[in-house]
């Protein structure tokens, strides 16, 4: 993330938008189950909302500094933070009842790696498990937040085909 994006993702405005808007809307009437995987928690705004609602949450974060910060902040809670690449997770098959991925898939540097992340997530989900997430669509403001940053947009009209390519 570039500096502007990193600051915004840690802001009170973003926290309010996520915790009072996006998360309740996306997860309304959804039972996530007892073991939940969060992919790419970043600074942990979505993690904070989730950990109050699920018994056990495992987060996979590729960024060393973000993973270290989350581990320290969430030590002693129901959250396990794993520093790692979600395209190559070390969990056994069928480890989680559900997986969530919020506003981060566009940070994965290629469609092929996005497909790999989707396939790997499918592998670690129990049969019939849920994969739930959201991402931003491309807009002028969205692109400004990603100047000099990795940004491979996930377009809604192409996502079903992308899931098919990942053999999910």
Positions of PLM-derived features:
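A conserved beta-strand element that flanks and buttresses the S-adenosyl-L-methionine
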Residues: 100-101
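Conserved small/polar residues in nucleotide/adenosyl-binding loops
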Residues: 166-168
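Conserved alpha-helix/loop element of class I SAM-dependent methyltransferases that forms part
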Residues: 15-34
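Class I SAM-dependent methyltransferase SAM/SAH-binding core
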Residues: 43-88
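Conserved class I S-adenosyl-L-methionine
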Residues: 33-42
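A short glycine-rich, Lys/Arg-flanked "PGG" loop and its adjoining helix->strand segment in the class I
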Residues: 115-127
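Class I SAM-dependent methyltransferase Rossmann-like catalytic core
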Residues: 1-17
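Conserved beta-strand signature within the Rossmann-like core of class I S-adenosyl-L-methionine
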Residues: 128-135
């Amino acid at each position: 993330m570039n500096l502007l994006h990193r600051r915004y993702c840690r802001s009170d405005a973003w926290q309010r938008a996520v915790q009072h808007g996006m998360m309740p809307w996306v997860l309304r009437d959804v039972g996530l189950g007892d073991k939940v995987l969060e992919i790419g928690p970043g600074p942990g705004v979505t993690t904070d909302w989730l950990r109050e609602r699920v018994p056990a949450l495992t987060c996979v974060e590729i960024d060393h500094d973000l993973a270290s910060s989350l581990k320290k902040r969430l030590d002693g809670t129901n959250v396990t933070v794993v520093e790692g690449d979600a395209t190559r997770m070390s969990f056994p098959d069928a480890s989680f009842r559900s997986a969530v991925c919020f506003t981060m898939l566009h940070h994965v540097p290629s469609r092929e790696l996005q497909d790999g992340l989707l396939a790997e997530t499918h592998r670690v989900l129990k049969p019939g498990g849920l994969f739930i997430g959201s991402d931003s669509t491309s807009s002028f403001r969205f692109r400004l937040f990603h100047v000099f940053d990795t940004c491979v947009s996930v377009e809604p009209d192409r996502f079903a085909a992308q899931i098919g390519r990942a053999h999910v």
